[in-house]
């Protein structure tokens, strides 16, 4: 199988990438996702993460290393599995980063990543700009209002918008919900794009290695239905497998600390 762009991981970012890149009909896009689509109603109900976190179909069920200050306990590290990734099982808070973080990225040599440059893309993703990601206001209540007032009394300023570039202070968050239902990125971004002839989604495909020619990534090997497959990329391979599995996949492909790879017998 061959495409112009191969995206590994259909999670919070991967679904957005697949939807946006396939807007160009000249690009052939393949999205490789280890999880399977699910009709589990708890994935749509906001309180449902109590049922889905820890479920082997929806959560990779990672654990931390033993914690020496907690009697060597291993703590759960939930990571979503399936189209939508961790946005399937997270707390649904919609919170953009702080202006200073983006401005620092630009100052380090990444033009176009400053806050004023990226903010239009945040705005574009929401319905006010014909975007697909619904964000809802939390209903106000007396107890939360009292908490905000108490924070102000303690010197913590109230804020009406955590997404305006300064997310310090006390106030009401926004939620990625619509009409009381969770809006994960699989539903918001990927589902409307799946009918495009230039987008193919490989569900149940576990990526095992990035293929290289010299220093250039040219494809991905994966296992689907117990069979090994290779998806070749004419232009780019994009790793979007999350904070744990993107570096893991690089290490399985021979990219990482030489000492670690040597101990594991990885070339």
Where are these regions (language model features)?
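Residue-level detector of alpha-helix initiation sites
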Residues: 11-16, 142, 243-244
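Conserved redox-cofactor binding core of oxidoreductases
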Residues: 106-217, 223
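Short, well-ordered alpha-helices that flank and scaffold nucleotide-derived cofactor binding pockets
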Residues: 19, 23, 195, 251
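Glycine-rich loop(s) and the adjacent beta-strand/alpha-helix scaffold that form part
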Residues: 24-30, 35-38, 210-213, 220-267
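N-terminal glycine-rich phosphate/pyrophosphate-binding loop and immediately adjacent elements
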Residues: 1-121, 262-263, 267
């Amino acid at each position: 199988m061959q495409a112009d762009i191969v995206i590994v991981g259909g999670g919070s970012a991967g679904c957005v990438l697949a939807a946006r890149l396939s807007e160009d009909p000249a690009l052939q896009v393949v999205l490789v996702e280890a999880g399977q689509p699910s009709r589990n109603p708890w994935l749509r109900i906001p309180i449902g993460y109590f049922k889905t976190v820890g479920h082997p179909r929806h959560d990779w069920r990672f654990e931390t290393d033993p914690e020496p200050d907690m009697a060597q306990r291993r703590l759960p590290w939930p990571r979503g599995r399936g189209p939508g990734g961790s946005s399937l099982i997270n707390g649904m808070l919609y919170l953009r980063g702080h202006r200073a973080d983006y401005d620092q990225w630009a100052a380090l040599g990444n033009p176009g990543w400053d806050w004023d440059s990226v903010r239009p893309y945040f705005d574009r993703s929401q319905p006010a700009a014909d975007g697909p990601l619904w964000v809802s206001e939390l209903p106000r209540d007396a107890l939360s209002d009292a908490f905000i007032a108490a924070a102000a009394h303690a010197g913590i300023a109230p804020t009406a918008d955590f997404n305006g570039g300064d997310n310090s202070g006390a106030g009401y968050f926004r939620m990625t919900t619509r009409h009381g239902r969770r809006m994960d990125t699989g539903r918001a971004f990927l589902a409307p794009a799946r009918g495009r002839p230039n987008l193919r989604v490989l569900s149940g495909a576990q990526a095992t290695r990035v293929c290289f020619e010299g220093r250039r990534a040219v494809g991905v090997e994966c296992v689907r239905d117990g069979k090994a497959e290779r998806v070749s990329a004419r232009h780019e391979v994009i790793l979007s497998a999350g904070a744990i599995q993107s570096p893991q996949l690089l290490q399985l492909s021979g990219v990482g600390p030489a000492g670690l790879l040597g101990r594991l017998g990885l070339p």
